[in-house]
Design a protein with these regions (language model features):
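Feature captures the FAD/FMN-dependent oxidoreductase FAD-binding
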Residues: 69-109, 115
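Phosphate/oxyanion-binding active-site loops and adjacent basic polyanion-contact surfaces
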Residues: 67-78, 180-183, 210
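Generic structural hydrophobic/aromatic packing signal, biased to beta-strands
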Residues: 46, 116-118, 191, 251
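ACP-dependent fatty acid/polyketide chain-elongation machinery
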Residues: 1-61, 69, 83, 134-141
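Nucleic-acid-interacting cores, centered on viral/eukaryotic replication and modification enzymes
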Residues: 19-43, 99-102, 117-118, 128, ...
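Mixed-charge, low-complexity intrinsically disordered regions
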Residues: 1, 115-120
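Acyl-thioester C-C bond-transforming condensing/cleaving domain
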Residues: 62-63, 86-91, 100-105, 123-251
Length: 251
């Protein structure tokens, strides 16, 4: 399956709206990006991807994970399959003593010898941008509504309320109690929990060298006898939702 799509003109327009200045290599001068012709040409974006449906990750866990962690965990599951490591069905015991199926994991003997390293430059960024953007939009609307009501223009205020009906902006913003879990870099811990990997576990950020550094550390762990194998999961998605107009613009 192909999970890569082309970037729409609408999304590229948001990059233009950032009023970026770029360096012209031929003249050595800075010039403003004002049209779609001035933004990057070679670019793609990730398509639809549902980690719970495609990879069997618990839906509650998937709802907390940021996009980068979802991609990293999916890559980790694929790596386990490619390596031919066995997975056994897990069970949890209820209060009545019954055992219920609880997903698949590495055999305990294999899991104890398996470490996990999560390498990423922008973990949690999409969740952070989304939360701040929603809060800012609702706050801006509150100010506009307040000014309209104070001016006595009840007709325009009523029209605005009608247009907002059925949208996410209709109700007041409420801070998510899961905010910290969503923005923290937790791909390594969730991967270990999902697969039952009980060896050494960490995450790192070395920008574009994150994956290479992770493999180097994994080699050191194995040579030092800390584990027999290390699952290195590395991912970033700068094209996801609002990431592109911020991180993409930075590039």
């Amino acid at each position: 399956d192909n999970f890569i799509e082309s970037v729409s003109a609408e999304r590229l327009g948001k990059v233009v709206a950032k009023k970026i200045e770029r360096l012209e290599k031929s003249s050595g001068r800075f010039s403003a990006i004002n049209t779609l012709d001035d933004v990057f040409k070679i670019a793609g974006q990730t398509g639809d991807f549902e980690i719970a449906e495609t990879y069997g990750v618990d839906e509650a866990m998937a709802g907390v994970l940021d996009r980068t962690s979802q991609l990293a965990i999916a890559a980790g599951i694929d790596a386990i399959r490619d390596a031919g490591l066995p997975l056994v069905e897990r069970f949890r015991e209820t209060k009545t003593g019954r055992k219920l199926a609880n997903g698949w994991a590495l055999p305990e003997s294999v899991g104890r010898e398996t470490g996990v390293i999560f390498a990423s430059a922008f973990p949690g960024v999409d969740r952070l941008i989304d939360e701040v953007s929603r809060s800012s939009r609702v706050e801006a609307l509150r100010e506009v509504m307040g000014e309209l009501e104070a001016s006595g223009d009840t007709q325009l205020a009523t029209q605005l309320k009608e247009r907002l009906k059925g949208t996410n902006l209709e109700s007041d913003y409420s801070f998510s109690r899961k905010f910290l879990f969503r923005i923290l870099s937790m791909g390594h811990t969730q991967m270990a929990q999902h697969l039952g990997a009980l060896g050494p576990n960490t995450q790192l950020n070395a920008a574009c060298a994150s994956g290479s550094q992770a493999i180097s550390i994994a080699t050191d762990w194995i040579n030092a006898g800390r584990c027999k194998r290390v699952l290195v999961i590395s991912a970033d998605d700068v094209t996801y939702r609002q990431n592109l107009e911020w991180i993409g613009s930075g590039f």
